[in-house]
């Protein structure tokens, strides 16, 4: 993963870590600077001194929760997908007080967030380090479709989607489905959840990709949360993701979904479950897992291929650059 450090809007450093492969595609998140003044919400990383005096790379996710409230999540080792040890997680809380700096407090640290960096002290007021702001971008964002792909949506009118509604900016709104039916495939999806800081749970930027109209890969603003089986990246109500790879809302994110349909014999009896592998922002979050049956409000399982749906759950989730390769 390559991610770019921001300091007052300037790129000042880059880091590179590993990549991964999905069905022949090279996948790895990459970061890019965005212009303008950032909010406090976002991702930060840097070296902090731990209680034993040793330096440790540390990540921090700052989550807007509405009405001036903020949640901070300190992650030992780094950000999700970038060296976090997937074990140690410390929460901090704070409230905007009308000053340029947001102050968060946890049982062990105080964090002063100015939107570009975070000054961290222990409970005695001693400095333990500074975290810099990073903006991460999935390296699969903007991936062009291969020659064998069917382009579902590329920014304009399309005959491959039914009930497609397109914004003046050329983005796809929720509530459409493919005109064709599909059996086994690899699917590329780019999506963006809205900023809804006061919303909670399933009311916070909800949509979903319904494979064959039967199995939902959930889309939700789950940034900074401990993933449950109905959060972003989950196989809805069946399995949470291995790792919460959600970026902040209003950030473009990607799914790569490698899907194999359930198998049935000539008598219509099920002989094998549907299986899939999912990458979220380039990181594998499900590896060849079995689906026990349809998810949520999905259509009943059967041998027939069916369309892919992009769920309308009432929130303004947006899509772009959708394409599929049949297997």
Positions of PLM-derived features:
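Alpha-helical interaction segments
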Residues: 15, 33-35, 242-245
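Cleavable N-terminal signal peptides
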Residues: 19-21, 30-31
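Short, solvent-exposed loop/hinge segments that bridge or flank secondary-structure elements
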Residues: 27-30, 35-67, 160-169
């Amino acid at each position: 993963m390559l991610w770019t450090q921001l300091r007052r809007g300037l790129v000042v450093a880059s880091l590179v870590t590993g990549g991964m492969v999905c069905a022949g595609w090279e996948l790895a998140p990459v970061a890019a600077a965005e212009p303008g003044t950032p909010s406090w919400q976002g991702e930060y990383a840097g070296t902090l001194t731990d209680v034993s005096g040793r330096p440790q790379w540390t990540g921090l996710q700052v989550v807007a929760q509405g009405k001036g409230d903020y949640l901070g999540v300190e992650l030992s080792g780094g950000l999700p997908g970038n060296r976090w040890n997937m074990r140690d997680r410390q929460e901090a809380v704070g409230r905007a007080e009308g000053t340029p700096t947001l102050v968060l407090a946890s049982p062990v640290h105080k964090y002063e967030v100015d939107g570009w960096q975070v000054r961290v002290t222990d409970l005695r007021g001693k400095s333990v380090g500074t975290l810099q702001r990073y903006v991460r971008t999935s390296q699969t964002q903007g991936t062009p479709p291969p020659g064998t792909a069917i382009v579902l949506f590329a920014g304009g009118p399309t005959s491959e989607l039914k009930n497609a509604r397109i914004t003046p900016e050329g983005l796809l709104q929720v509530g459409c489905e493919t005109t064709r039916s599909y059996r086994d495939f690899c699917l590329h999806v780019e999506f963006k959840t809205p900023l809804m800081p006061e919303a909670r749970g399933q009311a916070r930027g909800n949509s979903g990709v319904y494979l064959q109209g039967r199995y939902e890969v959930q889309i939700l603003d789950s940034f900074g949360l401990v993933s449950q089986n109905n959060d972003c990246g989950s196989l809805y109500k069946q399995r949470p993701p291995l790792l919460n790879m959600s970026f902040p809302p209003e950030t473009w994110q990607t799914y790569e979904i490698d899907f194999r349909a359930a198998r049935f014999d000539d008598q219509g009896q099920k002989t094998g479950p549907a299986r899939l592998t999912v990458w979220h922002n380039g990181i594998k979050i499900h590896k060849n897992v079995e689906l026990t049956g349809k998810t949520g409000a999905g259509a009943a399982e059967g041998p027939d291929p069916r369309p892919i749906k992009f769920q309308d759950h009432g929130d303004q989730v947006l899509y772009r650059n959708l394409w599929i390769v049949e297997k």
